[in-house]
Every structure is written in C-alpha cells, then in structure tokens.
Curated annotation (Swiss-Prot):
SUPFAM superfamilies: Aspartate/glutamate racemase (SSF53681)
Taxonomic lineage: Bacteria, Bacillati, Bacillota, Bacilli, Bacillales
Entry keywords, A to Z: Cell shape, Cell wall biogenesis/degradation, Isomerase, Peptidoglycan synthesis
Gene Ontology biological process terms in this record: cell wall organization; peptidoglycan biosynthetic process; regulation of cell shape
Transmembrane segments: none
Matching PROSITE patterns: ASP_GLU_RACEMASE_1, ASP_GLU_RACEMASE_2
Role this protein plays: Provides the (R)-glutamate required for cell wall biosynthesis.
Enzyme Commission no: 5.1.1.3
Catalytic activity: L-glutamate = D-glutamate
Protein's name in the database: Glutamate racemase
Pathway: Cell wall biogenesis; peptidoglycan biosynthesis
Active-site residues from the entry: C72 (proton donor/acceptor), C183 (proton donor/acceptor)
InterPro entries linked to this entry: Asp/Glu/hydantoin_racemase (IPR015942), Asp/Glu_race (IPR001920), Asp/Glu_racemase_AS_1 (IPR018187), Asp/Glu_racemase_AS_2 (IPR033134), Glu_race (IPR004391)
Organism: Shouchella clausii (strain KSM-K16)
Amino acid sequence: MSRPIGIIDSGIGGLTVASEIMRQLPKEPIVYIGDSARCPYGPRPVEEVRAFTWQMIGRLLHEDVKMIVIACNTATAVVLEEARAQLDIPVVGVIRPGAISAIQVSENRHVAVIGTIGTIASNAYTMALHSIDENVTVESLACPLFVPLVEQGTIKGPEAEAVVRESLAPLQGAGFDTLILGCTHYPLLKPVIEACLPSVTVISSGEETAREVSSLLFYHSMNEQHQAKATHRFYTTGEANQFKQLAASWLNIHTDSVASIHLDGPLPVQATMKSK
C-alpha cells in the first residue's frame, strides 16, 4: 500500500492546499486532518497552538505518512522548524512558498500580508519576504473575522462583503501591488477580497506549496509512480457531514471517506523522531 501525504490545518481552510496537491499530484494519496472543533488557532496562545499541532502530527504519524504539510499559517509559524528538526520525514509549511510567489509577482516591491492574529504577530511573513528580498516593503494586517466567516460557510453575499470591506479598510491607499492571503482559509474569500482591492494581485500559497511538495517527493525518490488513482482519507474534529458538504460545494472535493475524530493529549511520536 502506498504511503500517503499528511496534511493538517486548524479546520477546512487547508483543503485549499489539499485540492491543489490533488490536482498537481493525482497519484498521491492524502490523509487530511482539520481541527474544526478548536478553530480558529490565530487568537490562541503559542503553546496551545503547538500542543494542538503536535496532536495532529502524532495522528498522521500513526497513519504512516511519508511527508507532512502544515497547511495552516499559524501552525507553520509556531511548529515548522521544530517539526523539521525532530521528525525523520519531510515537513512543508505554507509561509515561504507564498512569500516566494509574491516576490516573483510584485512589480513595485511592495507587498501586503493579511492573516490571523497569531501569524501576523509572529512576523513570519515579513521575515520570509525579507530573506528573499531585503528591500521589499511589507504591510501586515490581522483579519481575525475571516476564519469564523469561512468555517460557518459564509464566503459570499452581503455579510461576507461587509466584513471583508471593513477588515481591509486600513490597507486602502497603502500603495502595495500584491497581497498575500496569509491563511489557508482566506482563498475561499478571494473573489470578495479581489473586489475590494481591484488593482492588486492576490496570492494564495496552495499552488506554490504543491510545487514544493512535488519537488521534495522527487528529490527524496518518494513520488508515487504505480498507483492509477489515489485514495484519500479526511478527518475532522468537527461535524463530518458539514465538512463533506463544504469540501464538495467549495472545492469540488467529493469523498465518502470523512470521519470525525477526537484529539486529546500528546500522542506518542518518539518512534518517528530523528535519532540523536
């Protein structure tokens, strides 16, 4: 049996990354965990985000995944480097791929980033952007109302438009030509965001993250070559039917393999740690 790629997120937003991986790598099986019961992660203390993320990682390791994608910007900012240091499988985050894409696209070297409170407070995007181009100007804005909006299924219409317009008001007239959606929930609001910022190029990290996953699989000779069609499994700490409906209606991900799970307490991950 082929070893799957593991993907984790604070909820359903990581499906925007999962769908892009499924599109670019159709032979690769995926195991996805979305922690909708404890979403959003953005306002939570760092140690809580760390604990929740490691619980999901532990569950993925019991699924014998060959790679982990942290498809949550808040969790990427908190856990990515320590996960890479401690695990013996590749771990991919979503921050640097988004930063690379923004630098490539921006013509005036002026980029804005919107994200959760935790992601913006971490300065992870600013550091990633400056590591690529130290002269790029960066605007950052937390938009804490976006994730709850998406999780409740309000991605268009008057309510979504009003929340997005009010949240983005501080960025109006700032002079940037490129906007990074620094949360994997936000691409589901992309049409509404683009309507508020019509002259700005909007970047989501899913496509670039999928490219990095593909490159790492080939580099480590882990890419699936024989399977005709991949089988995917999805887990949520929330309500399985709601997850299934949102995945189908928003991202055209149709699956009967959605199960509700409970994550509580640290899971034994030591067996997969790198030997000292």
